[in-house]
Regions:
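Alpha-helical scaffold segments
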Residues: 2-264
């Protein structure tokens, strides 16, 4: 009679082979050449995992796992975190950090890939808002943390993440970054204020929303005047525009206006 380990035959059939933690599945099929531990992570119950990791293998054998992907499987299964937190591989340390293990330690890690995993979990945020990498600070903003502090961050991408959380858009109305102002305009903020913005793409958004057309009809940018024409504003003026696309668009609205007048 076949020996029963976990009671899950999909797992036990491998355990009967007296496998090591580094075993790769050699049965042809979906999991061929997958590490057994990755397989266990996908199909094992909490009880299955506990039995295999603690009774069948044991910590001493797990510490000897080889291969980055196999070690990552051990970490994702929740074992040997302290040991692998000291790994020379930033990929392995980052995986430990993903588990929320010792965030204050990893907040000072030399690798930004490790620190960002801490930030993504919203941990050690009081440390990471001062991180030298803007990507890490941005991850903290994306967790809706310390927005009052990060609102004045020198990096526009961080400030953009702060705004994206809905934090006090009025603070960023005249932001020096056109990217930030463009984002606000796209969201429909301060359109009247942006009628005279230096960035054409922002003025174009304003025109598309039908704001400030009396000013934008004279804009030096052809694309913006085209947007004004699309709104059907003053076609009798724009049919004489210097740009052919603007004139053609204005003619459509001019003819429509004339036919409407004739109808009435």
């Amino acid at each position: 009679m076949a020996k029963i380990y976990t009671g899950n035959e999909a797992i036990d059939k491998y355990l009967r082979r007296n496998i090591s933690p580094n075993y790769k599945i050699n049965d042809y099929g979906e999991y061929w050449q997958h590490y057994f531990l990755s397989y266990l992570l996908k199909i094992g119950s909490k009880e299955d995992i506990q039995y295999v990791m603690e009774e069948y293998f044991g910590e001493e054998r797990l510490l000897k796992c080889k291969g980055t992907n196999n070690i990552i499987a051990v970490i994702r299964l929740g074992y040997c975190l302290d040991y692998f937190s000291r790994s020379e591989s930033y990929l392995i340390r980052a995986e430990v950090a993903k588990q929320g293990y010792k965030p204050n330690l990893f907040a000072h890690d030399q690798s930004v890939d490790v620190r960002i995993e801490v930030a993504k979990k919203g941990l050690a945020s009081n440390i990471l808002i001062h991180d030298r990498s803007s990507v890490v600070r941005q991850a903290i903003a994306n967790k809706d943390l310390h927005l009052d502090y990060l609102a004045t961050d020198p990096d526009p991408y961080v400030r953009l993440s702060v705004i994206d959380q809905g934090y006090k858009p009025e603070l960023f109305k005249d932001d020096p970054s056109s990217m930030v102002r463009h984002f606000l305009a796209q969201k429909g903020f301060f359109l009247e204020h942006y009628v005279t913005d230096e960035m054409p793409q922002i003025r174009e958004i304003v025109a598309k929303n039908g704001i400030g057309l009396d000013t934008l009809i004279h804009d030096k940018n052809d694309g913006i005047r085209f947007r004004v024409a699309e709104q059907g504003y003053r076609p009798e003026v724009l049919i004489y525009d210097t740009n052919s696309s603007v004139r053609n668009e204005a003619k459509k609205h001019f003819k429509k206006a004339q036919s409407t007048e004739l109808f009435y």
